[in-house]
């Protein structure tokens, strides 16, 4: 990826700003190569002070960029794409969408001309360079996919998937960050109930969750094989696990993911 490449983030809200922060933390982008665009531009003054380029003019942001990353709400994406379309150039621009629900084909229709397009679905852990980002792209070549992969590999891990799997990836990868955070919160509350201070309970829950994830990431084992290592006959761990399963722990997580996928499928249509 060229060291002079400029990125415009159209819709610099929570996820857009998380992407910007992650790219800068990677060391491969200085803030001056990233333009943040949103209507309520006054909310970006802290980022302007950090050296980011800030504007409320989407077309101007596109004209001074090489990669255009669209990160707006599904309900307004049609209008945004229509307005920036005249400034998009096939030979210069890579268009990356992190908008839930809108397909590459639909993006092409809204832009009204051929473009190299990739879809990406990161999560907010991108701000600390630990995102799980799923990517998919269209033809005529792999330039959009390659650029998306390079950008998002700087801020976590990427996984190329079929575009038809993007809604499922949204539910598990993007929404899922909240589910695991809620699990950490619940674990810390349990720690408080059995006598730990709130501060210590949260610290223990966070590091324990991190350790569990690392066991799977580094070792490549299945979760149940690691669970077997800490569940002894008549022990306290298996008692706790069985109690949580009786209360519907696994089924609640599974149902949450399926409901999120169902809702994600409706967001763009509802717009």
Question: Whereabouts are the PLM-identified features?
Answer:
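NAD(P)-dependent Rossmann-like dehydrogenase/reductase catalytic/cofactor-binding core
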Residues: 2-3, 206-271
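Small-residue helix-packing motif on alpha-helices
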Residues: 34, 61, 197-205, 226, ...
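Glycine/serine-rich anion-binding loops at beta->alpha junctions
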Residues: 121-126, 170-180
């Amino acid at each position: 990826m060229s060291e002079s490449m400029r990125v415009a983030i159209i819709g610099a809200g929570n996820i857009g700003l998380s992407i910007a922060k992650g790219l800068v933390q990677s060391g491969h982008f200085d803030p001056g190569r990233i333009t943040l665009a949103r209507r309520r531009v006054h909310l970006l003054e802290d980022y302007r002070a950090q050296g980011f380029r800030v504007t409320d003019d989407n077309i101007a942001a596109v004209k001074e960029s090489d990669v255009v990353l669209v990160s707006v709400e599904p309900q307004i994406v049609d209008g945004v794409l229509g307005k920036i379309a005249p400034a998009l150039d096939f030979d210069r621009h890579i268009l990356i969408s992190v908008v839930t629900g809108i397909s590459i084909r639909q993006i092409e229709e809204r832009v009204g001309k051929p473009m190299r397009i990739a879809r990406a679905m990161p999560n907010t852990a991108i701000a600390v360079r630990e995102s799980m980002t799923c990517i998919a792209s269209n033809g005529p070549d792999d330039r959009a996919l390659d650029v998306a992969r390079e950008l998002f590999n700087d801020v976590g891990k990427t996984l190329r998937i079929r575009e038809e799997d993007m809604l499922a990836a949204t539910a598990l990868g993007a929404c899922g960050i909240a589910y695991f955070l809620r699990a950490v919160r619940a674990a810390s509350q349990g720690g408080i109930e059995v006598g730990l201070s709130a501060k210590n309970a949260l610290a223990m829950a966070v590091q324990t969750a991190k350790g569990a994830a690392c066991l799977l990431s580094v070792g490549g084992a299945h979760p149940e094989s690691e669970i077997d290592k800490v569940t002894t006959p008549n022990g306290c761990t298996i008692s706790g696990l069985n109690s949580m399963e009786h209360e519907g722990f696994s089924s609640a997580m599974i149902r949450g993911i399926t409901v999120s996928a169902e809702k994600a499928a409706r967001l763009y249509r509802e717009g």
